[in-house]
């Protein structure tokens, strides 16, 4: 009889343990109406938080540019402590913003911070004129790109558009500089955008690179 009572007690304890275990398992499971965030959503939220955290302590010019581009184009493709980059955003091949400011006094004092570029076939004979018109123009003949570094996207549109007109002979260096100053004044004082600051006035080619050709003994591996 004593053994029977012990067996019954052990069985009762076992059943109680199973019941508590099952109850605990049920409470850990999400309710039917709950929805777990998708992996992509979690990564996007993490990237968004990271970009905002990174630029929070940046210098004024790059921080302002970064905030404007995030608002317009969404999250950058690359984020580091010193730079953020978008690829193929809008009409641009890329947009790069670094946490640094470069003093630039044309046409009025400001700080360059944002580099944006497009595909473009650069004519070497026009390079001097383009750079004389605006020193913040960036030319890369090998990759086939032209870009500008300024503090605002409309100013980069303006810089690249007028560089195109200098390259094509539509405007002289002086004419391009005068037009640049006029367009900036219209944008800053009248809060209006003209054709030069609203977007690109030309269609960038799909591929404009110039790979050049082998030269000298090194280029031909010693073969004649």
Name every feature range the model reports, one short phrase each.
Residues 44, 50-94, 98-224:
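Non-cytosolic coordination micro-motifs
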Residues 1-10:
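Bacterial N-terminal signal peptides that target proteins for export
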Residues 9-19:
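Bacterial N-terminal signal peptides
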């Amino acid at each position: 009889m004593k053994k029977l009572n012990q067996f019954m007690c052990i069985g009762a304890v076992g059943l109680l343990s199973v019941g508590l275990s099952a109850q605990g398992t049920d409470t850990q499971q999400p309710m039917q109406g709950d929805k777990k965030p998708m992996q992509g959503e979690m990564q996007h939220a993490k990237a968004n938080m990271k970009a905002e955290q990174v630029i929070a302590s940046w210098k004024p010019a790059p921080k302002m540019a970064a905030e404007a581009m995030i608002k317009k184009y969404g999250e950058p493709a690359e984020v580091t402590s010193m730079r953020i980059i978008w690829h193929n955003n809008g009409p641009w091949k890329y947009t790069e913003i670094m946490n640094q400011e470069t003093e630039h006094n044309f046409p009025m004092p400001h700080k360059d911070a944002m580099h944006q570029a497009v595909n473009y076939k650069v004519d070497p004979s026009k390079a001097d004129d383009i750079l004389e018109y605006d020193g913040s123009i960036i030319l890369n003949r090998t990759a086939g790109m032209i870009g500008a570094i300024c503090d605002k996207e409309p100013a980069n549109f303006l810089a690249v558009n007028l560089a195109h007109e200098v390259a094509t002979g539509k405007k002289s260096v002086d004419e391009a500089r005068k037009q640049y100053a006029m367009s900036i004044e219209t944008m800053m004082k009248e809060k209006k955008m003209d054709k030069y600051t609203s977007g690109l006035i030309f269609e960038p080619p799909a591929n404009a690179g110039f790979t050049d050709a082998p030269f000298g003994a090194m280029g031909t591996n010693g073969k004649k």
